[in-house]
Swiss-Prot record:
GO annotation terms (biological process): negative regulation of L-ascorbic acid biosynthetic process
InterPro entries in the cross-refs: KIB1-4_b-propeller, SCF_F-box_domain
Annotated F-box domain residues: 2-50
Source organism of this protein record: Arabidopsis thaliana
Name under which the protein is recorded: Putative F-box protein At1g65770
Upper lineage: Eukaryota, Viridiplantae, Streptophyta, Embryophyta, Tracheophyta
Highest taxon, organism lineage: Eukaryota
């Protein structure tokens, strides 16, 4: 067996330079003493230092050290694939964010940002292999640590032409906004957008009638690709195997849901999905009948794809989503799928098993 502790420092530096996140770096440095000493941990030279808090302060005259400010900040969450080190072939999907005051990780419901119910207060990470697979953002109020009102249904952190961070967000009304140092400003007045995604370092937005736009580094919008048919439901962008897809949620008639406090809200039940992909040869969007061995995860703040066999219970050719806070799955089955409705916690051995880690 090879002695991994004798690998040359130059090679270890090359490996470390290809790691994705701070968690992977910690795992790398825990292998042995020579690996730990080859790459810095905490400090200025750490390639994955804690991200600085991005503050969105509407009153620039107030000092940013004033914790009573009525400002906003960009809240980052991340999705992880977690496997037992002794059994790495399959794992669970978890989501977490970081408390801006304590720096501690909070586990969240994977398809929303609601706190996840669990009995364990601490988890020994040395027993697991953890890989970050996706990040997502929301704009939160500094005082409440909750979403701002009106809310942003989608938020993206992008690079402008100077290489600096720029925050783009889509309001619940569909209006595209960007943060201009002092205030939020609207982009592309008269248009309504449904999603935004960073794909291969480029930013794309999807409007409410199914047109995809490329957003340049100077925040100019350029139409990219043809219209995706008639609008019939909510549409999202999903990256899969280096390409992006458009997922359309089909909804039925709205019904009125009553809460325990006698208030109510309008709720449209999901009845199906359609998936589209741009066909270069035909120059148009084509409906996709099968996702193969992939599954799409449609969270409230981002979307992404996974290899089904890498997660416990995950179905191939399926779309996981929430409907009125309930996790469901939709099998495409050549375009003739059916939705499975359930609460996930009684079903730890079912197709929702990947959302219920056995160690929590």
């Amino acid at each position: 067996m090879a002695d991994w502790s004798t690998l040359p420092v130059d090679l270890l530096n090359m490996i470390a330079g290809r790691l994705f996140s701070n968690i992977e770096l910690k795992r790398f440095r825990s292998i042995c003493r020579s690996w730990r000493s080859s790459v810095p941990g905490a400090g200025k030279k750490n390639p994955f230092r804690t991200r600085p808090l991005i503050l969105l302060n509407p009153n620039p005259n107030k000092p940013l050290t004033d914790h009573r400010r009525r400002g906003e900040f960009l809240s980052r969450s991340a999705f992880f694939r977690v496997t037992l080190s002794s059994s790495p072939s399959q794992g669970w999907l978890i989501k977490s964010d970081v408390d801006v005051s304590s720096g501690k990780l909070h586990l969240l419901d994977p398809l929303s940002r609601l706190p996840m119910e669990h009995s364990r207060k601490r988890v020994d990470l040395s027993e697991f292999t953890i890989t970050e697979i996706r990040e997502a953002y929301q704009v939160h109020d500094w005082r409440t640590r909750k979403e701002t009102r009106p809310i942003f249904k989608r938020v993206a952190l992008v690079k402008d032409k100077e290489g600096d961070n720029q925050v783009l967000g889509i309001r619940s009304t569909g209006k595209m906004m960007y943060w201009d140092i002092k205030t939020w400003k609207a982009k592309e007045e008269g248009y309504e957008f449904s999603d935004i995604i960073v794909h291969k370092g480029q930013t794309y937005a999807l409007d409410s009638i199914g047109i995809v736009y490329w957003i340049r580094s100077d925040l100019k919008f350029i139409r990219f690709g043809p219209l995706v048919g008639d609008w019939t439901g909510d549409r999202r962008l999903v990256e899969c195997c280096g390409e992006f897809y458009i997922v359309e949620r089909l909804v039925g008639e709205s019904t009125w849901k009553r809460k325990a406090d006698d208030t109510g809200y309008e709720y449209a039940k999901t009845v199906g999905f359609k998936v589209y992909k741009f066909d270069d040869e035909q120059g148009k969007m084509m409906e996709v009948k099968s996702l193969g061995d992939k599954a799409f995860v449609i969270a409230t703040d981002t979307c992404f794809s996974v290899l089904a066999h890498e997660f416990y219970g995950c179905l191939e050719n399926a779309i996981y989503f929430t409907d009125d806070t309930m996790i469901k799955v939709f099998k495409l089955d050549n375009g003739n799928g059916s939705s499975i409705e359930t609460t996930i916690y009684p079903y730890a051995q079912s197709c929702f098993q990947m959302f219920v880690p056995s160690f929590l």
